[in-house]
Protein backbone atom coordinates (compact mmCIF):
# COMPACT_ATOMS: atom_id res chain seq x y z
CA UNK A 1 0.00 0.00 0.00
CA UNK A 2 2.85 2.33 0.87
CA UNK A 3 4.52 1.66 -2.50
CA UNK A 4 1.22 2.27 -4.29
CA UNK A 5 0.80 5.66 -2.63
CA UNK A 6 4.39 6.58 -3.52
CA UNK A 7 3.80 5.59 -7.14
CA UNK A 8 0.51 7.51 -7.31
CA UNK A 9 2.04 10.59 -5.71
CA UNK A 10 5.01 10.47 -8.11
CA UNK A 11 2.65 10.16 -11.10
CA UNK A 12 0.59 13.15 -10.00
CA UNK A 13 3.73 15.22 -9.45
CA UNK A 14 4.99 14.14 -12.89
CA UNK A 15 1.76 15.22 -14.59
CA UNK A 16 1.83 18.58 -12.80
CA UNK A 17 5.48 19.17 -13.72
CA UNK A 18 4.81 18.20 -17.34
CA UNK A 19 1.90 20.63 -17.45
CA UNK A 20 4.06 23.39 -16.02
CA UNK A 21 6.83 22.67 -18.56
CA UNK A 22 4.41 22.67 -21.51
CA UNK A 23 2.78 25.88 -20.27
CA UNK A 24 6.16 27.59 -20.00
CA UNK A 25 7.15 26.36 -23.46
CA UNK A 26 3.82 27.60 -24.85
CA UNK A 27 4.32 31.02 -23.31
CA UNK A 28 7.89 31.20 -24.65
CA UNK A 29 6.66 30.21 -28.12
CA UNK A 30 3.85 32.77 -28.00
CA UNK A 31 6.22 35.51 -26.85
CA UNK A 32 8.52 34.54 -29.73
CA UNK A 33 5.66 34.85 -32.22
CA UNK A 34 4.68 38.25 -30.83
CA UNK A 35 8.27 39.47 -30.84
CA UNK A 36 8.87 38.31 -34.41
CA UNK A 37 5.65 39.94 -35.61
CA UNK A 38 6.67 43.32 -34.15
CA UNK A 39 10.38 43.27 -35.03
CA UNK A 40 11.37 45.77 -37.71
CA UNK A 41 12.81 44.11 -40.81
CA UNK A 42 16.30 45.28 -41.72
CA UNK A 43 16.71 45.48 -45.50
CA UNK A 44 20.12 44.39 -46.78
CA UNK A 45 21.83 45.85 -49.84
CA UNK A 46 20.89 44.30 -53.21
CA UNK A 47 17.69 42.72 -51.92
CA UNK A 48 14.79 41.31 -53.93
CA UNK A 49 11.12 41.40 -52.92
CA UNK A 50 9.64 37.95 -53.60
CA UNK A 51 5.90 37.81 -54.30
CA UNK A 52 5.49 34.12 -53.53
CA UNK A 53 1.76 33.59 -53.94
CA UNK A 54 0.16 30.45 -52.56
CA UNK A 55 -3.16 30.47 -50.77
CA UNK A 56 -6.01 32.96 -50.71
CA UNK A 57 -6.42 36.71 -50.88
CA UNK A 58 -8.66 38.86 -48.69
CA UNK A 59 -9.04 42.60 -48.21
CA UNK A 60 -7.32 42.25 -44.84
CA UNK A 61 -6.11 39.33 -42.77
CA UNK A 62 -6.02 38.90 -39.02
CA UNK A 63 -2.93 37.26 -37.56
CA UNK A 64 -3.73 33.68 -36.59
CA UNK A 65 -1.41 32.65 -33.73
CA UNK A 66 -3.16 29.29 -33.37
CA UNK A 67 -2.24 28.41 -36.94
CA UNK A 68 1.34 29.52 -36.31
CA UNK A 69 1.56 27.49 -33.09
CA UNK A 70 0.35 24.40 -34.95
CA UNK A 71 2.90 24.96 -37.72
CA UNK A 72 0.31 25.20 -40.49
CA UNK A 73 1.66 26.26 -43.89
CA UNK A 74 -1.58 27.54 -45.41
CA UNK A 75 -1.15 31.14 -46.46
CA UNK A 76 -3.70 33.95 -46.42
CA UNK A 77 -2.72 37.36 -47.74
CA UNK A 78 -4.25 40.78 -47.18
CA UNK A 79 -4.56 42.94 -50.29
CA UNK A 80 -3.76 45.95 -48.10
CA UNK A 81 -0.45 44.37 -47.02
CA UNK A 82 0.51 43.45 -50.60
CA UNK A 83 -0.16 46.93 -52.00
CA UNK A 84 1.70 48.59 -49.12
CA UNK A 85 4.65 46.20 -49.54
CA UNK A 86 4.99 46.95 -53.27
CA UNK A 87 4.96 50.66 -52.48
CA UNK A 88 7.70 50.20 -49.85
CA UNK A 89 9.77 48.17 -52.31
CA UNK A 90 9.50 50.96 -54.88
CA UNK A 91 10.69 53.60 -52.41
CA UNK A 92 13.51 51.56 -50.82
CA UNK A 93 16.82 51.97 -52.69
CA UNK A 94 18.21 48.72 -51.26
CA UNK A 95 15.52 46.68 -53.01
CA UNK A 96 16.57 46.17 -56.63
CA UNK A 97 13.53 44.42 -58.03
CA UNK A 98 10.57 42.10 -57.61
CA UNK A 99 10.49 38.38 -58.28
CA UNK A 100 6.97 37.05 -58.89
CA UNK A 101 6.65 33.37 -58.04
CA UNK A 102 2.95 32.65 -58.67
CA UNK A 103 2.25 29.17 -57.33
CA UNK A 104 -1.48 29.65 -56.71
CA UNK A 105 -3.65 32.46 -55.41
CA UNK A 106 -7.41 32.28 -54.89
CA UNK A 107 -8.34 35.81 -55.94
CA UNK A 108 -10.73 37.69 -58.21
CA UNK A 109 -9.59 39.59 -61.27
CA UNK A 110 -10.44 42.94 -59.63
CA UNK A 111 -7.95 42.24 -56.82
CA UNK A 112 -5.38 40.93 -59.29
CA UNK A 113 -5.82 44.12 -61.30
CA UNK A 114 -5.12 46.25 -58.20
CA UNK A 115 -1.89 44.31 -57.58
CA UNK A 116 -1.02 44.52 -61.26
CA UNK A 117 -1.49 48.30 -61.27
CA UNK A 118 0.72 48.58 -58.19
CA UNK A 119 3.40 46.62 -60.06
CA UNK A 120 3.08 48.95 -63.05
CA UNK A 121 3.65 51.85 -60.68
CA UNK A 122 6.67 50.01 -59.24
CA UNK A 123 8.17 49.72 -62.74
CA UNK A 124 8.29 53.51 -63.00
CA UNK A 125 11.19 53.36 -60.52
CA UNK A 126 13.29 51.63 -63.19
CA UNK A 127 13.63 48.49 -61.09
CA UNK A 128 13.14 45.05 -62.64
CA UNK A 129 10.25 42.59 -62.34
CA UNK A 130 10.85 38.94 -63.19
CA UNK A 131 8.20 36.20 -63.11
CA UNK A 132 8.85 32.45 -62.99
CA UNK A 133 6.53 29.48 -62.50
CA UNK A 134 6.27 25.81 -63.35
CA UNK A 135 2.61 26.30 -64.21
CA UNK A 136 0.89 29.66 -64.59
CA UNK A 137 -2.82 29.60 -63.82
CA UNK A 138 -4.65 32.09 -66.02
CA UNK A 139 -5.16 34.63 -63.23
CA UNK A 140 -1.54 34.35 -62.20
CA UNK A 141 -0.44 34.80 -65.81
CA UNK A 142 -2.58 37.94 -66.05
CA UNK A 143 -0.78 39.29 -62.98
CA UNK A 144 2.65 38.17 -64.19
CA UNK A 145 2.22 39.64 -67.67
CA UNK A 146 3.37 42.97 -66.26
CA UNK A 147 6.88 41.55 -65.72
CA UNK A 148 9.90 42.63 -67.78
CA UNK A 149 10.69 38.96 -68.33
CA UNK A 150 8.34 35.99 -68.05
CA UNK A 151 10.21 32.73 -67.50
CA UNK A 152 8.66 29.28 -67.62
CA UNK A 153 10.00 25.86 -66.71
CA UNK A 154 10.96 23.79 -69.80
CA UNK A 155 8.24 21.32 -68.78
CA UNK A 156 5.81 23.99 -67.62
CA UNK A 157 2.53 25.40 -68.89
CA UNK A 158 0.52 28.62 -69.10
CA UNK A 159 -3.21 28.70 -68.48
CA UNK A 160 -4.87 30.68 -71.26
CA UNK A 161 -8.41 29.60 -72.06
CA UNK A 162 -10.87 32.47 -71.61
CA UNK A 163 -13.24 33.32 -68.76
CA UNK A 164 -16.08 31.20 -67.45
CA UNK A 165 -18.43 30.73 -64.51
CA UNK A 166 -20.25 27.59 -63.43
CA UNK A 167 -23.11 28.15 -60.95
CA UNK A 168 -24.33 25.25 -58.82
CA UNK A 169 -28.05 24.41 -58.65
CA UNK A 170 -29.64 22.78 -55.60
CA UNK A 171 -33.27 22.35 -56.69
CA UNK A 172 -33.18 18.56 -56.93
CA UNK A 173 -31.23 18.26 -53.69
CA UNK A 174 -33.74 20.49 -51.91
CA UNK A 175 -36.59 18.42 -53.32
CA UNK A 176 -35.01 15.14 -52.20
CA UNK A 177 -34.68 16.56 -48.70
CA UNK A 178 -38.42 17.20 -48.66
CA UNK A 179 -38.12 20.98 -48.65
CA UNK A 180 -40.23 23.47 -50.60
CA UNK A 181 -38.81 26.89 -51.47
CA UNK A 182 -41.11 29.90 -51.77
CA UNK A 183 -39.60 32.92 -53.47
CA UNK A 184 -40.46 36.63 -53.46
CA UNK A 185 -38.42 38.99 -55.62
CA UNK A 186 -38.37 42.14 -57.71
CA UNK A 187 -36.26 42.38 -60.82
CA UNK A 188 -35.96 40.27 -63.95
CA UNK A 189 -32.25 39.76 -63.26
CA UNK A 190 -32.49 39.13 -59.49
CA UNK A 191 -31.49 35.51 -59.86
CA UNK A 192 -29.95 34.76 -56.45
CA UNK A 193 -32.89 32.40 -55.83
CA UNK A 194 -32.40 30.42 -59.05
CA UNK A 195 -30.10 27.75 -57.57
CA UNK A 196 -32.98 26.68 -55.28
CA UNK A 197 -35.85 26.74 -57.80
CA UNK A 198 -34.25 25.80 -61.13
CA UNK A 199 -31.75 23.40 -62.64
CA UNK A 200 -30.24 25.84 -65.12
CA UNK A 201 -29.83 29.57 -65.68
CA UNK A 202 -32.77 31.67 -66.78
CA UNK A 203 -32.32 33.54 -70.09
CA UNK A 204 -32.03 36.85 -68.19
CA UNK A 205 -29.38 35.50 -65.84
CA UNK A 206 -27.46 33.93 -68.69
CA UNK A 207 -27.56 37.29 -70.49
CA UNK A 208 -26.15 39.27 -67.55
CA UNK A 209 -23.50 36.67 -66.70
CA UNK A 210 -22.38 36.52 -70.33
CA UNK A 211 -22.09 40.29 -70.64
CA UNK A 212 -20.18 40.55 -67.35
CA UNK A 213 -17.80 37.79 -68.43
CA UNK A 214 -17.21 39.44 -71.79
CA UNK A 215 -16.48 42.77 -70.08
CA UNK A 216 -13.98 41.15 -67.69
CA UNK A 217 -12.34 39.15 -70.49
CA UNK A 218 -12.07 42.28 -72.65
CA UNK A 219 -10.15 43.97 -69.83
CA UNK A 220 -7.83 40.98 -69.38
CA UNK A 221 -7.12 40.89 -73.11
CA UNK A 222 -6.42 44.63 -73.24
CA UNK A 223 -4.02 44.56 -70.28
CA UNK A 224 -2.08 41.50 -71.45
CA UNK A 225 -1.97 42.88 -75.00
CA UNK A 226 -0.51 46.14 -73.73
CA UNK A 227 2.18 44.41 -71.66
CA UNK A 228 3.11 41.61 -74.07
CA UNK A 229 2.51 43.58 -77.28
CA UNK A 230 0.31 40.88 -78.73
CA UNK A 231 -2.88 41.92 -80.57
CA UNK A 232 -6.08 41.16 -78.66
CA UNK A 233 -7.45 39.16 -81.62
CA UNK A 234 -4.37 36.95 -81.47
CA UNK A 235 -4.72 36.48 -77.70
CA UNK A 236 -8.36 35.56 -78.16
CA UNK A 237 -7.41 33.02 -80.83
CA UNK A 238 -4.88 31.51 -78.40
CA UNK A 239 -7.65 31.15 -75.79
CA UNK A 240 -9.82 29.30 -78.31
CA UNK A 241 -6.96 26.84 -78.75
CA UNK A 242 -6.83 26.19 -74.97
CA UNK A 243 -3.12 26.85 -74.49
CA UNK A 244 -2.85 25.04 -71.14
CA UNK A 245 -1.44 21.83 -72.66
CA UNK A 246 1.05 23.24 -75.16
CA UNK A 247 4.75 22.41 -75.16
CA UNK A 248 6.78 25.06 -73.36
CA UNK A 249 8.60 26.12 -76.54
CA UNK A 250 5.28 27.11 -78.10
CA UNK A 251 4.69 29.73 -75.41
CA UNK A 252 7.95 31.38 -76.46
CA UNK A 253 6.92 31.29 -80.12
CA UNK A 254 3.55 32.83 -79.24
CA UNK A 255 5.30 35.54 -77.16
CA UNK A 256 3.36 34.58 -74.05
CA UNK A 257 6.71 33.93 -72.33
CA UNK A 258 10.27 35.12 -72.94
CA UNK A 259 12.52 32.19 -72.09
CA UNK A 260 12.75 28.70 -70.60
CA UNK A 261 14.72 28.07 -67.42
CA UNK A 262 14.88 25.65 -64.54
CA UNK A 263 14.59 27.06 -61.02
CA UNK A 264 18.35 27.01 -60.33
CA UNK A 265 18.97 28.97 -63.54
CA UNK A 266 16.38 31.54 -62.49
CA UNK A 267 18.13 32.01 -59.13
CA UNK A 268 21.45 32.60 -60.91
CA UNK A 269 19.77 35.11 -63.22
CA UNK A 270 18.27 36.97 -60.27
CA UNK A 271 21.68 37.14 -58.60
CA UNK A 272 23.06 38.84 -61.70
CA UNK A 273 20.20 41.34 -61.81
CA UNK A 274 20.52 42.23 -58.13
CA UNK A 275 24.31 42.53 -58.15
CA UNK A 276 25.05 39.39 -56.14
CA UNK A 277 27.90 36.97 -56.84
CA UNK A 278 27.09 33.45 -58.01
CA UNK A 279 28.26 31.96 -54.70
CA UNK A 280 26.20 34.40 -52.63
CA UNK A 281 22.68 33.79 -51.43
CA UNK A 282 19.84 35.94 -52.68
CA UNK A 283 18.79 38.61 -50.22
CA UNK A 284 15.10 37.73 -50.39
CA UNK A 285 12.27 39.58 -48.67
CA UNK A 286 8.81 38.04 -48.52
CA UNK A 287 5.45 39.68 -47.80
CA UNK A 288 5.67 38.84 -44.09
CA UNK A 289 9.08 40.57 -44.03
CA UNK A 290 7.92 43.63 -45.96
CA UNK A 291 5.05 44.24 -43.54
CA UNK A 292 7.66 45.17 -40.91
CA UNK A 293 9.89 47.22 -43.22
CA UNK A 294 9.92 50.86 -42.17
CA UNK A 295 8.47 53.24 -44.75
CA UNK A 296 11.20 55.24 -46.47
CA UNK A 297 9.21 58.48 -46.25
CA UNK A 298 9.06 61.22 -43.57
CA UNK A 299 6.41 60.64 -40.91
CA UNK A 300 3.41 62.94 -41.28
CA UNK A 301 3.10 65.47 -38.44
CA UNK A 302 -0.02 67.31 -39.57
CA UNK A 303 -2.37 65.28 -37.40
CA UNK A 304 -4.73 64.85 -40.35
CA UNK A 305 -6.13 61.36 -40.82
CA UNK A 306 -7.85 59.71 -43.75
CA UNK A 307 -9.65 56.66 -42.42
CA UNK A 308 -9.97 53.60 -44.65
CA UNK A 309 -12.91 51.55 -43.41
CA UNK A 310 -12.89 47.98 -44.75
CA UNK A 311 -16.43 46.66 -45.24
CA UNK A 312 -16.11 43.16 -46.64
CA UNK A 313 -18.21 40.02 -46.62
CA UNK A 314 -21.92 39.33 -46.20
CA UNK A 315 -24.04 42.02 -44.55
CA UNK A 316 -25.54 40.34 -41.49
CA UNK A 317 -27.81 41.82 -38.82
CA UNK A 318 -26.64 39.34 -36.19
CA UNK A 319 -23.64 37.24 -37.29
CA UNK A 320 -23.51 33.74 -35.87
CA UNK A 321 -20.73 32.65 -33.57
CA UNK A 322 -19.02 30.73 -36.39
CA UNK A 323 -19.29 33.54 -38.94
CA UNK A 324 -16.24 35.55 -39.98
CA UNK A 325 -15.34 37.83 -42.88
CA UNK A 326 -18.74 39.49 -42.65
CA UNK A 327 -20.14 42.98 -42.13
CA UNK A 328 -21.68 43.11 -38.66
CA UNK A 329 -24.35 45.80 -39.11
CA UNK A 330 -24.43 47.00 -35.51
CA UNK A 331 -20.64 47.16 -35.24
CA UNK A 332 -20.19 49.00 -38.53
CA UNK A 333 -22.86 51.57 -37.66
CA UNK A 334 -21.16 52.18 -34.31
CA UNK A 335 -17.74 52.50 -35.98
CA UNK A 336 -19.03 55.02 -38.54
CA UNK A 337 -20.51 57.13 -35.75
CA UNK A 338 -17.10 57.17 -34.04
CA UNK A 339 -15.41 58.29 -37.27
CA UNK A 340 -18.05 61.00 -37.64
CA UNK A 341 -17.25 62.38 -34.18
CA UNK A 342 -13.45 62.13 -34.57
CA UNK A 343 -12.26 65.60 -35.58
CA UNK A 344 -8.81 64.29 -36.56
CA UNK A 345 -10.42 62.20 -39.31
CA UNK A 346 -10.78 64.58 -42.25
CA UNK A 347 -12.21 62.10 -44.76
CA UNK A 348 -13.27 58.46 -44.96
CA UNK A 349 -12.58 55.99 -47.75
CA UNK A 350 -15.14 53.22 -47.52
CA UNK A 351 -13.57 50.12 -49.06
CA UNK A 352 -16.51 47.91 -50.01
CA UNK A 353 -16.06 44.27 -50.98
CA UNK A 354 -19.47 42.76 -50.39
CA UNK A 355 -22.08 40.77 -52.34
CA UNK A 356 -24.77 42.23 -50.07
CA UNK A 357 -26.96 40.54 -47.50
CA UNK A 358 -29.63 41.87 -45.16
CA UNK A 359 -31.80 44.55 -46.79
CA UNK A 360 -32.65 46.00 -43.37
CA UNK A 361 -29.00 46.07 -42.32
CA UNK A 362 -27.99 47.70 -45.61
CA UNK A 363 -30.40 50.56 -44.96
CA UNK A 364 -29.06 51.09 -41.43
CA UNK A 365 -25.51 51.38 -42.75
CA UNK A 366 -26.72 53.66 -45.57
CA UNK A 367 -28.14 56.00 -42.93
CA UNK A 368 -24.81 56.19 -41.07
CA UNK A 369 -22.96 56.91 -44.33
CA UNK A 370 -25.37 59.80 -45.01
CA UNK A 371 -24.78 61.20 -41.51
CA UNK A 372 -21.01 60.76 -41.89
CA UNK A 373 -21.08 62.63 -45.22
CA UNK A 374 -22.72 65.61 -43.50
CA UNK A 375 -19.47 66.25 -41.60
CA UNK A 376 -16.69 65.01 -43.91
CA UNK A 377 -16.14 63.56 -47.40
CA UNK A 378 -16.94 59.89 -47.92
CA UNK A 379 -15.33 58.20 -50.94
CA UNK A 380 -16.17 54.62 -51.86
CA UNK A 381 -13.55 52.29 -53.29
CA UNK A 382 -15.11 49.09 -54.63
CA UNK A 383 -13.12 45.87 -54.52
CA UNK A 384 -13.97 42.52 -56.11
CA UNK A 385 -17.68 43.23 -55.84
CA UNK A 386 -19.98 45.80 -54.30
CA UNK A 387 -23.33 44.51 -55.44
CA UNK A 388 -26.90 44.70 -54.17
CA UNK A 389 -26.51 45.48 -50.45
CA UNK A 390 -22.88 46.31 -51.21
CA UNK A 391 -24.09 48.97 -53.65
CA UNK A 392 -26.81 50.07 -51.23
CA UNK A 393 -24.23 51.06 -48.59
CA UNK A 394 -22.09 52.76 -51.28
CA UNK A 395 -24.62 54.85 -53.19
CA UNK A 396 -24.72 57.80 -50.76
CA UNK A 397 -20.98 58.52 -50.99
CA UNK A 398 -19.57 61.74 -52.45
CA UNK A 399 -17.75 59.74 -55.13
CA UNK A 400 -17.52 56.09 -56.11
CA UNK A 401 -14.44 54.40 -57.57
CA UNK A 402 -14.43 50.87 -58.99
CA UNK A 403 -12.01 48.66 -60.86
CA UNK A 404 -13.06 47.84 -64.44
CA UNK A 405 -13.59 44.19 -63.40
CA UNK A 406 -15.48 44.95 -60.17
CA UNK A 407 -18.96 43.42 -60.12
CA UNK A 408 -21.52 45.94 -58.88
CA UNK A 409 -25.11 47.11 -59.30
CA UNK A 410 -27.63 44.32 -58.67
CA UNK A 411 -30.16 46.88 -57.43
CA UNK A 412 -32.95 44.63 -56.22
CA UNK A 413 -34.06 42.51 -53.28
CA UNK A 414 -35.60 39.11 -52.73
CA UNK A 415 -37.04 36.92 -50.03
CA UNK A 416 -36.83 33.16 -49.72
CA UNK A 417 -38.58 30.88 -47.25
CA UNK A 418 -38.18 27.14 -46.74
CA UNK A 419 -41.09 24.88 -45.89
CA UNK A 420 -40.36 21.39 -44.55
CA UNK A 421 -43.88 19.96 -44.35
CA UNK A 422 -42.96 16.90 -46.42
CA UNK A 423 -39.65 16.44 -44.59
CA UNK A 424 -41.25 16.66 -41.17
CA UNK A 425 -44.33 14.50 -41.78
CA UNK A 426 -43.25 11.89 -44.34
CA UNK A 427 -39.55 11.49 -43.56
CA UNK A 428 -39.23 12.32 -39.87
CA UNK A 429 -42.72 11.34 -38.77
CA UNK A 430 -43.46 14.68 -37.09
CA UNK A 431 -46.93 16.22 -36.96
CA UNK A 432 -47.97 19.73 -35.97
CA UNK A 433 -51.21 21.22 -34.75
CA UNK A 434 -52.05 24.82 -33.97
CA UNK A 435 -54.39 27.03 -32.00
CA UNK A 436 -54.56 30.74 -32.81
CA UNK A 437 -56.55 33.88 -32.14
CA UNK A 438 -56.07 35.43 -35.57
CA UNK A 439 -55.90 34.21 -39.15
CA UNK A 440 -52.12 34.57 -39.63
CA UNK A 441 -50.93 34.09 -36.06
CA UNK A 442 -48.96 30.99 -37.04
CA UNK A 443 -47.22 32.61 -40.02
CA UNK A 444 -43.53 31.86 -39.62
CA UNK A 445 -43.92 28.91 -37.25
CA UNK A 446 -40.76 26.89 -37.78
CA UNK A 447 -38.19 24.42 -36.58
CA UNK A 448 -34.93 26.31 -36.93
CA UNK A 449 -34.86 28.08 -40.31
CA UNK A 450 -37.51 25.77 -41.86
CA UNK A 451 -41.23 26.59 -41.76
CA UNK A 452 -43.57 23.84 -40.60
CA UNK A 453 -45.98 24.67 -43.45
CA UNK A 454 -45.83 26.63 -46.73
CA UNK A 455 -47.34 30.10 -46.95
CA UNK A 456 -50.84 30.30 -48.39
CA UNK A 457 -51.87 32.69 -51.19
CA UNK A 458 -52.75 35.65 -48.95
CA UNK A 459 -49.54 35.24 -46.95
CA UNK A 460 -47.51 35.09 -50.15
CA UNK A 461 -49.15 38.31 -51.34
CA UNK A 462 -48.23 39.93 -48.03
CA UNK A 463 -44.58 38.94 -48.43
CA UNK A 464 -44.41 40.06 -52.07
CA UNK A 465 -45.80 43.50 -51.16
CA UNK A 466 -43.15 43.77 -48.45
CA UNK A 467 -40.42 42.98 -50.99
CA UNK A 468 -41.92 45.48 -53.46
CA UNK A 469 -41.72 48.25 -50.85
CA UNK A 470 -38.12 47.34 -50.09
CA UNK A 471 -37.21 47.49 -53.79
CA UNK A 472 -38.85 50.91 -54.21
CA UNK A 473 -36.89 52.20 -51.21
CA UNK A 474 -33.63 50.81 -52.65
CA UNK A 475 -34.27 52.57 -55.98
CA UNK A 476 -35.04 55.84 -54.21
CA UNK A 477 -31.85 55.60 -52.13
CA UNK A 478 -29.80 55.11 -55.31
CA UNK A 479 -31.55 57.96 -57.14
CA UNK A 480 -30.92 60.31 -54.21
CA UNK A 481 -27.28 59.30 -53.81
CA UNK A 482 -26.39 59.33 -57.50
CA UNK A 483 -28.46 62.45 -58.26
CA UNK A 484 -30.41 60.59 -60.92
CA UNK A 485 -34.12 60.21 -61.50
CA UNK A 486 -35.87 57.09 -60.22
CA UNK A 487 -36.77 56.30 -63.84
CA UNK A 488 -33.07 56.36 -64.80
CA UNK A 489 -32.18 54.08 -61.89
CA UNK A 490 -34.98 51.65 -62.71
CA UNK A 491 -33.57 51.23 -66.22
CA UNK A 492 -30.27 49.91 -64.80
CA UNK A 493 -31.80 48.18 -61.77
CA UNK A 494 -34.03 45.08 -61.97
CA UNK A 495 -31.33 43.25 -60.00
CA UNK A 496 -28.88 43.38 -62.91
CA UNK A 497 -25.15 43.02 -62.25
CA UNK A 498 -22.67 45.26 -64.08
CA UNK A 499 -18.90 45.36 -64.21
CA UNK A 500 -17.16 48.51 -63.02
CA UNK A 501 -16.47 49.54 -66.61
CA UNK A 502 -20.14 49.11 -67.54
CA UNK A 503 -21.33 50.83 -64.34
CA UNK A 504 -19.27 53.93 -65.11
CA UNK A 505 -20.98 54.33 -68.48
CA UNK A 506 -24.36 53.98 -66.74
CA UNK A 507 -23.65 56.56 -64.04
CA UNK A 508 -23.54 54.09 -61.15
CA UNK A 509 -19.81 54.72 -60.67
CA UNK A 510 -17.87 58.00 -60.99
CA UNK A 511 -14.37 56.85 -61.91
CA UNK A 512 -12.38 53.71 -62.64
CA UNK A 513 -9.44 53.06 -60.36
CA UNK A 514 -8.25 51.39 -57.20
CA UNK A 515 -7.94 52.46 -53.61
CA UNK A 516 -5.00 54.81 -54.30
CA UNK A 517 -7.17 56.95 -56.57
CA UNK A 518 -9.90 56.94 -53.95
CA UNK A 519 -7.42 58.14 -51.31
CA UNK A 520 -6.25 60.97 -53.57
CA UNK A 521 -9.85 62.01 -54.18
CA UNK A 522 -10.56 61.95 -50.44
CA UNK A 523 -7.57 64.21 -49.74
CA UNK A 524 -8.58 66.62 -52.51
CA UNK A 525 -12.17 66.81 -51.34
CA UNK A 526 -11.05 67.35 -47.73
CA UNK A 527 -8.62 70.06 -48.86
CA UNK A 528 -5.54 68.48 -47.26
CA UNK A 529 -2.11 67.64 -48.67
CA UNK A 530 -0.43 66.01 -45.68
CA UNK A 531 -2.12 63.18 -43.85
CA UNK A 532 -1.67 59.71 -42.42
CA UNK A 533 -3.80 56.71 -43.38
CA UNK A 534 -5.35 54.52 -40.68
CA UNK A 535 -7.30 51.34 -41.37
CA UNK A 536 -10.55 50.52 -39.57
CA UNK A 537 -11.88 48.45 -37.88
CA UNK A 538 -8.65 48.18 -35.90
CA UNK A 539 -7.05 44.75 -36.09
CA UNK A 540 -6.88 42.72 -32.90
CA UNK A 541 -3.48 42.37 -31.31
CA UNK A 542 -2.06 38.87 -31.13
CA UNK A 543 -3.04 38.31 -27.48
CA UNK A 544 -6.63 39.39 -28.10
CA UNK A 545 -6.70 37.10 -31.12
CA UNK A 546 -5.48 34.15 -29.11
CA UNK A 547 -8.05 34.76 -26.37
CA UNK A 548 -10.81 35.45 -28.88
CA UNK A 549 -12.14 33.45 -31.81
CA UNK A 550 -8.97 31.75 -32.98
CA UNK A 551 -10.59 28.32 -33.11
CA UNK A 552 -13.19 29.79 -35.49
CA UNK A 553 -10.49 31.48 -37.62
CA UNK A 554 -8.45 28.28 -37.74
CA UNK A 555 -11.37 26.07 -38.76
CA UNK A 556 -12.48 28.54 -41.44
CA UNK A 557 -8.99 28.79 -42.89
CA UNK A 558 -8.79 24.99 -43.09
CA UNK A 559 -12.18 24.84 -44.85
CA UNK A 560 -11.06 27.60 -47.22
CA UNK A 561 -7.91 25.69 -48.12
CA UNK A 562 -9.84 22.46 -48.72
CA UNK A 563 -12.71 23.95 -50.78
CA UNK A 564 -10.64 26.41 -52.80
CA UNK A 565 -12.78 28.12 -55.44
CA UNK A 566 -15.97 26.58 -53.97
CA UNK A 567 -15.50 28.37 -50.63
CA UNK A 568 -17.71 31.33 -51.62
CA UNK A 569 -20.60 28.99 -52.48
CA UNK A 570 -20.16 27.25 -49.13
CA UNK A 571 -20.22 30.57 -47.25
CA UNK A 572 -23.34 31.72 -49.10
CA UNK A 573 -25.17 28.56 -48.02
CA UNK A 574 -23.85 28.80 -44.46
CA UNK A 575 -25.03 32.40 -44.09
CA UNK A 576 -28.62 31.48 -45.00
CA UNK A 577 -29.17 30.43 -41.40
CA UNK A 578 -27.82 33.79 -40.14
CA UNK A 579 -29.79 35.92 -42.60
CA UNK A 580 -33.33 37.24 -42.39
CA UNK A 581 -35.70 36.33 -45.20
CA UNK A 582 -35.46 39.65 -47.10
CA UNK A 583 -32.11 40.02 -48.81
CA UNK A 584 -30.27 42.52 -50.99
CA UNK A 585 -27.73 40.05 -52.28
CA UNK A 586 -25.76 39.47 -55.46
CA UNK A 587 -27.45 36.87 -57.70
CA UNK A 588 -24.44 34.61 -58.31
CA UNK A 589 -21.10 33.56 -56.87
CA UNK A 590 -18.53 35.82 -58.60
CA UNK A 591 -15.99 33.06 -59.12
CA UNK A 592 -14.62 33.66 -62.62
CA UNK A 593 -12.28 30.92 -63.81
Where are these regions (language model features)?
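N-terminal type II signal-anchor transmembrane helix
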Residues: 2-42, 46
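Surface-exposed, non-catalytic interaction/assembly patches
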Residues: 173-184, 279-299, 414, 418, ...
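C-terminal long alpha-helix characteristic of the crotonase
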Residues: 226-227, 258-305, 475-481, 510-551
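Active-site proximal loops enriched in glycine and acidic residues that flank catalytic Cys/His/Asp
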Residues: 310-313, 352-354, 382-384, 404-406, ...
Amino acid sequence: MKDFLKFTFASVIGVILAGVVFTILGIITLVGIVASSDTETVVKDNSIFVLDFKGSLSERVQENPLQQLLGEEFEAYGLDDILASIKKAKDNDKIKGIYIQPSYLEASYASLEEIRNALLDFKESGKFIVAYADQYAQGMYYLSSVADKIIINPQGSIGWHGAGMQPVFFKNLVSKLGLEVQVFRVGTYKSAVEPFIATEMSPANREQMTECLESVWHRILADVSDSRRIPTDTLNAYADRYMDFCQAEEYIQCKLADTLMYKDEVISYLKQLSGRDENDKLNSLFIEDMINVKKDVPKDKSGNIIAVYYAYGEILDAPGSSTEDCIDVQKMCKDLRKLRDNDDVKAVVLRVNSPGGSAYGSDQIWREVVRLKEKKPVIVSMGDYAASGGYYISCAANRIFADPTTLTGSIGIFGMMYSGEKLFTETLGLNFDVVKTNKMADLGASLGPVLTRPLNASEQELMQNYVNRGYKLFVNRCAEGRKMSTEAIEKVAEGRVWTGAMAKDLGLVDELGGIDKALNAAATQAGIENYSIIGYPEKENIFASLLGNQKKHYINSEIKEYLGSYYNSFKALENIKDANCIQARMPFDPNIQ
